[in-house]
Design a protein with these regions (language model features):
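Conserved NTP phosphate-binding and transfer environment spanning the P-loop NTPase/kinase superfamily
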Residues: 9-156
Length: 156
């Protein structure tokens, strides 16, 4: 068994020469959260940004605007390196959890409200605050200690 992890793991150059029996798995959050009228409140990209903002703040001390400044490069890298090869995956695993917006809402809203002069990120800050207004908060004690979600809530 050979396991490659990371954004380049599905690149054809890495899989070249491996037996066709090799198995590619593409793992990412891929859920949009909608209201009862079918209006999207939060899409998968905003969930990913939320996860990053909270994680970077908790574990790296990066303020939300620092993460948002890097976000453009993250999306560019995704377009250049991940999207082209994601279609070669044998299986797609959606890592979104239905309860995530309820879990992150209060934290991300507080972080974003503390952001002074978001400048070019004003639209993103306002959109996220408005989106999370629709989700009531739930406590982190409901999340199992073994859950990968712990990376984003800092309970571990």
């Amino acid at each position: 068994i050979l396991i490659f992890e990371g954004i380049h793991a599905l690149q054809p150059q890495l899989r070249q020469g491996l037996a066709r029996s090799n198995f590619g798995i593409y793992i990412h959050p891929n859920t949009s959260y909608v209201d009862q009228d079918g209006r999207t409140l939060l899409d998968a990209r905003d969930l990913r940004l939320t996860r990053r903002i909270i994680r970077d703040n908790l574990h790296r001390g990066t303020p939300p605007l620092g993460t948002m400044r890097m976000w453009k490069d993250v999306l560019r890298g995704e377009l250049l390196y991940m999207k082209p090869s994601s279609g070669t995956a044998d299986v797609f695993v959606n890592t979104s959890h239905d309860y995530e917006p309820f879990l992150y809402g209060a934290v991300i809203t507080e972080l974003l409200k503390q952001t002074q002069d978001p400048g070019e990120n004003r639209e993103t800050v306002d959109r996220l605050i408005e989106s999370y207004r629709h989700f009531f908060p739930i406590g982190t004690e409901l999340i199992p200690q073994s859950s990968l979600i712990q990376e984003f809530i800092g309970s571990k």
